[in-house]
């Protein structure tokens, strides 16, 4: 019997993940997609890409049976808030989704609720926290450590022995050279090249990437 599953977030990432689920035969053999859950009032009961928005977070918090959930929110802080809130309902199982063409060794350790989109390559001896999102065409090199709630936007390349702290977001097309540390709650602007360590709670942009503001 298939497991019921909802996609939290009917925005861009949620719709992309729906598509990637629909073309993943192995995933569909295990899961039955019920629809979307979204906190946007205007979307409730509407159809989004062929699936209904069946409820909001309040509805899901009170769901009375086991239900698998993939949180599809690109913003790391929003994803963390939703995950912490939904964790109160022990019926919710936070599911990891791995697209069918992702390359990831069995020994790579990753936490619950992660997303690995089309064409990602995760190499060896890597540790990944909970609820991390790897958008399409990202690569992560050997011995890297990716924290909880990290977002890698499309085409990010992480070299070996890189550490990325919790709730950091790495912008589209960013490259990070080997043995660099990126702190917690960091935003790296699109197209940046990280060649030095980046401190926590800042926005860094450019080639090379440098902090432009702290938050």
Identify what each model region corresponds to:
Residues 25-30, 88-92:
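Short helix-capping segments at alpha-helix termini
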Residues 2-21:
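Glycine-rich adenosine-cofactor-binding loop
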Residues 96-205, 209-212:
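Structural signal for interior beta-strand "rungs" in well-ordered beta-sheet cores
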Residues 41-103:
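Phosphate-bearing ligand-interacting subdomains
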Residues 13, 42, 210:
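Conserved Rossmann-like nucleotide-cofactor binding loop
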Residues 26-46:
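NAD(P)-binding Rossmann-fold cofactor-contacting core
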Residues 4-5, 32-34, 66-70, 184:
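Short active-site oxyanion
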